[in-house]
A protein has these predicted regions:
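Canonical Radical SAM [4Fe-4S] cluster-binding loop centered on the CxxxCxxC motif
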Residues: 4-6, 10, 14-18, 23-57
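Fold-independent oxyanion-binding glycine-rich loops
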Residues: 15, 81, 133
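A secondary-structure boundary/capping signal
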Residues: 32, 79-80
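Conserved AdoMet/S-adenosylmethionine-binding subsite of the radical SAM
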Residues: 63-75, 84-221
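Auxiliary Fe-S-binding modules of radical SAM enzymes
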Residues: 1-25, 183-266
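Conserved alpha-helical substructure of the radical SAM core
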Residues: 47-77
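Short glycine-enriched, charge-decorated loop/helix-capping segments at active-site entrances
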Residues: 47-53, 143-153, 224-230
Length: 266
């Protein structure tokens, strides 16, 4: 599945001129692209991901807004949805942003489309990449539940995600791996399993971080999870402390909650 508008346009949900949560310890101009190849039942941007919120916007218009904000941000960050579905137009945008603003570039992805990532990395340097590791890659059935996929599809997806993570680690200076601690879907033990799997990949990146994130039932979350309570702050913190014992010392360990913001464990 790829969504390819004309090379001079992107299908977007909107943007935010200054964001403090998309790149650790930095301020970003954040752009949301529409559509996703996953159907996570807890997604906070579900209408965007499913294409209900979308508009076709010329790349030049986006660049103009970023140019106005460039003195107030460190990064130009693209998220979704799944941005790599529009990888060709995305590369065009990144190149124009770099040329006209000089900002560092950032991407948020589920890493399930390694061929799209390869195309992006072969055309432009992405300084920061955030990868949402939904569930243990060794457990396709659990990954399927968390990502809203059929198990047979997830069996192939987990291998593609692993490939995408490895590819990204070789093509960026700052890799931020994230997992959302979703009630009734993932336990602290599952997060520890994810951490062991990532640690075993022996990723070589100048800067690498793992972030345990709090689930919050925002307005955009589908009904099934909209009525659930947010993950307790203390559980998120304890889980981050637990996985700090798993990763090698070169990996930064963080947790993110509504109450505390971004907190580094080590």
């Amino acid at each position: 599945m790829h969504i390819q508008p004309s090379g001079s346009q992107l299908i977007i949900g909107g943007w935010k001129e200054t964001s403090l949560v998309d790149v650790l310890e930095s301020v970003s101009f954040t752009l949301w692209l529409s559509y996703c190849n996953f159907k996570c039942p807890w997604c906070s941007n579900s209408r965007l991901a499913r294409g209900y919120e979308k508009k076709v916007v010329p790349i030049g218009e986006i660049v103009s807004h970023v140019r106005e904000a460039r003195n107030f941000v460190d990064y130009f960050h693209v998220t979704g949805g799944e941005p790599t579905l529009q990888y060709r137009s995305l590369v065009t945008l990144y190149l124009k942003i770099k040329e006209e603003t000089g900002l560092k570039l950032s991407l948020d992805t589920n890493a399930s489309l390694p061929e799209a990532l390869q195309y992006i990395f072969s055309h432009v340097k992405i300084d920061h990449v955030a990868i949402d590791v939904k569930a243990p890659l060794s457990d396709a059935a659990l990954y399927a539940r968390v990502a809203g996929l059929q198990t047979k599809i997830a069996e192939k997806i987990v291998e593609r995600v692993r490939e995408g993570i490895m590819l990204t680690s070789q093509n960026t200076e700052f890799l931020e791996l994230r997992t959302l601690l979703v009630p009734d879907l993932l336990s602290p033990s599952d997060i520890e399993t994810i951490s062991r799997e990532l640690a075993n990949l022996d990723l070589k990146v100048p800067r690498i971080a793992y972030v345990v994130q709090q689930f919050i039932p925002y307005e955009g979350v589908p009904d099934e999870y909209r009525n659930k309570k947010k993950t307790p702050r203390e559980l998120v913190k304890q889980t981050a402390e637990r996985v700090a014992k798993v990763f090698p010392d070169n990996v930064e360990i963080w947790y993110r909650t509504n109450e505390d913001g971004n907190v580094r464990i080590r």
